[in-house]
Amino acid sequence: MNSVRAANRRPRRVSRPRPVQQQQQQPPQQPPPQPPQQQPPQQQPPPPPQQQQQQQPPPPPPPPPPLPQERNNVGERDDDVPADMVAEESGPGAQNSPYQLRRKTLLPKRTACPTKNSMEGASTSTTENFGHRAKRARVSGKSQDLSAAPAEQYLQEKLPDEVVLKIFSYLLEQDLCRAACVCKRFSELANDPILWKRLYMEVFEYTRPMMHPEPGKFYQINPEEYEHPNPWKESFQQLYKGAHVKPGFAEHFYSNPARYKGRENMLYYDTIEDALGGVQEAHFDGLIFVHSGIYTDEWIYIESPITMIGAAPGKVADKVIIENTRDSTFVFMEGSEDAYVGYMTIRFNPDDKSAQHHNAHHCLEITVNCSPIIDHCIIRSTCTVGSAVCVSGQGACPTIKHCNISDCENVGLYITDHAQGIYEDNEISNNALAGIWVKNHGNPIIRRNHIHHGRDVGVFTFDHGMGYFESCNIHRNRIAGFEVKAYANPTVVRCEIHHGQTGGIYVHEKGRGQFIENKIYANNFAGVWITSNSDPTIRGNSIFNGNQGGVYIFGDGRGLIEGNDIYGNALAGIQIRTNSCPIVRHNKIHDGQHGGIYVHEKGQGVIEENEVYSNTLAGVWVTTGSTPVLRRNRIHSGKQVGVYFYDNGHGVLEDNDIYNHMYSGVQIRTGSNPKIRRNKIWGGQNGGILVYNSGLGCIEDNEIFDNAMAGVWIKTDSNPTLRRNKIHDGRDGGICIFNGGRGLLEENDIFRNAQAGVLISTNSHPILRKNRIFDGFAAGIEITNHATATLEGNQIFNNRFGGLFLASGVNVTMKDNKIMNNQDAIEKAVSRGQCLYKISSYTSYPMHDFYRCHTCNTTDRNAICVNCIKKCHQGHDVEFIRHDRFFCDCGAGTLSNPCTLAGEPTHDTDTLYDSAPPIESNTLQHN
């Protein structure tokens, strides 16, 4: 490529004389016989048909004359071409034609008056040769039918296509268009795409047609896929009137006016500066073609609506390079509202990469009140200050599309100071700083950009920067894919933000923004970070497969997290900490490798109407002084706990559906004191609610049912309050209190549970007040194993085994209780002499007097009911153990002698009943 250094000079004004007529080509050494001379029609009228037939026939046609050798000789004619050469061939001679080329079918002879010999005289204008049809004679009376001139007939009807095309290949575009006006055949041949492609590439160099259907719009096409039959000609017409910057060609062009006759609408210059001045002085449309080459240190300040486009074969932008080493390569100033620059490489390559004394540090600078179009450009900068593209100032509103802004040692695209603009389909990659900066009320529209592999953040909006980002692909940047800071407020819609080496979206220091319907995935840190009083809107996004969490809100962060699909992340789907208080609603948080929502370190927030399911750890964690409000969520199908309060976790859990967890629906431990009300908790494999290790809590108005173990567990010094709950249809007991558990149970309905409505054991001491315990399949209340209780105003009725059972050594405080209408199945079985094993089940054990038999060598772990002692062990050495809850080992068939009362054994368990202990969450092992 040529390297051109501009000279500061005015555009050269070169006179362009008309082309000089070339010398007529010499005829062959043995010219054919000359036809008889014809007189002009003005001097002699044409002979009648009878007289023409009497004339002497012409000699046989000679070979065709040689083709012209020079382009500017194509228009010349041979005065000595015989008329016989163009006579119609007939008879046997037609079969021995010297041409073995294809011919056009002869057209019907036209009726016309004879004209001046069309081959007579030489002229440089092809219009005179091919442009005139035969004139009709003006005669009085009836008109006569006369045949066309023989030469015209030969050219139009009999000359082979290949010969015509060869002749046409020497014509320039205007003469070719004139030839197309001669006849239908010439029109078809003159529009041959190969002819126009050759002309087109000679002028514009493009190897594919460059279409220019309207101002500011250029695009290349594949000719075979274009609907127009001749896209080369169509593009030629669209691009015809323009100036060309082609170093070294201008002198040749203006020195050969005859060779380029008809191209007066084309101007040629050696430098871009000359072309900019020339098109303005010549009042052209401002279309400038910059041909292949490297143009260095030109002063390109554009302040008019010019159009500048690269012109080169192959990949155009790679062949046309404009470079500056001192100041901004291109500067668009006020007045360049509709300017266009496209299909070229623009470089800023200063000698001192970090020099601070540069007046400007940009490849391309767009200033106030201008809206140019930058299209299909490659933009590079090696300067470590400034940016590759800078758009600044009120009214700066460019359109930058299909550009490649990459490998720059600074910011790729910088939009600031109220600038706007449309930026579409650009490739922005591998820049040392952010791919895009938006600052100080800049408000661009950025669509379908590919922003990747940056050595910093992908997009950085800060200091009140705004913008609308749509359908961008942002990935593999060293820091976050998208960063929002310091009151910036962008809108990001339907983008893909993924594979960030840190996070996906980072909003901090009072940043805002709307992030809507994006795909955020596979980032090394959180998909979305919100911190330090920031308040963005995160709506309708898919946030998945992150190497850490989904959404991470900390440091007084806020925000609306709504309608997102958050799944498959390595840590919690949403994490809220350190006084953060977001609104989290209508999200799906599922299939995480950790928990669903994790609120800790005094985190807050309103978490409502979410669906949290199928997570490996707890659906929701609340810990370390946090106080969120969880309302109307569906938390289900987890592999551990549904909602887990621990280490002083607080908050409100209300109106939620919590079901089908492998552990408990809710666990409360270690000083946690939540308010749990109006929830439905069912399907837990380890019970409904487990309160342990000094857990607290106010549990009110809940419905707790169909759990595999107890509806509510209270153990290990825990002291919750349960009011107005309905605890029913459990596959174990209603409420189990043991290991020093306490609590206030007030106004609850406890019914239809498989074991005791309330079981109190192992040094526990709860208060039961005004509860209704009924329709149980075992006892109403059982108190055993040195436990105590205060029972006030309870109603205990219609339970199968009985109302209240107290084991040996148990002392309770009772007041105003009503124990009535229970079925007393144990007493009835004893009175009928039945083995009490008959009324036991795998998990339901009757409370009565139990013994051991020394004769049968029973151990401390064996117990025998009173009827088996009387019948099966009559006369044996027996010992009373205590009045407590056992099943009969004699009836179960576990002793050496068979039971004579039980018959065939129907149970196979010898486990002592103390209600199988609940499984405590091991979530802490994963913190």
Swiss-Prot record:
Keywords: Chromosome, Disease variant, Intellectual disability, Metal-binding, Nucleus, Repeat, Ubl conjugation pathway, Zinc, Zinc-finger. It is found in: Nucleus; Chromosome. Substrate recognition component of a SCF (SKP1-CUL1-F-box protein) E3 ubiquitin-protein ligase complex which mediates the ubiquitination and subsequent proteasomal degradation of target proteins, such as DTL/CDT2, BCL6, SNAI1 and PRDM1/BLIMP1. The SCF(FBXO11) complex mediates ubiquitination and degradation of BCL6, thereby playing a role in the germinal center B-cells terminal differentiation toward memory B-cells and plasma cells. PROSITE patterns: FBOX, ZF_UBR. One of its GO terms (cellular component) is nucleus. Residues 153-199 form the F-box domain. Changing residue 206 to C: Found in a patient with lymphoma. It comes from Homo sapiens (Human). Residues 7-16 have a biased composition (Basic residues). Isoform 5 is expressed in keratinocytes, fibroblasts and melanocytes. NCBIfam families: para_beta_helix. The keyword Repeat applies. Pfam families: Beta_helix (PF13229), F-box-like (PF12937), NosD (PF05048), zf-UBR (PF02207). This is F-box only protein 11. Component of the SCF(FBXO11) complex consisting of CUL1, RBX1, SKP1 and FBXO11. Interacts with CIITA. InterPro entries: Beta_helix (IPR039448), Carb-bd_sugar_hydrolysis-dom (IPR006633), F-box-like_dom_sf (IPR036047), F-box_dom (IPR001810), F-box_FBXO11 (IPR047505), FBXO11_UBR-box (IPR047504), NosD_dom (IPR007742), Para_beta_helix_rpt-2 (IPR022441). Pathway: Protein modification; protein ubiquitination.
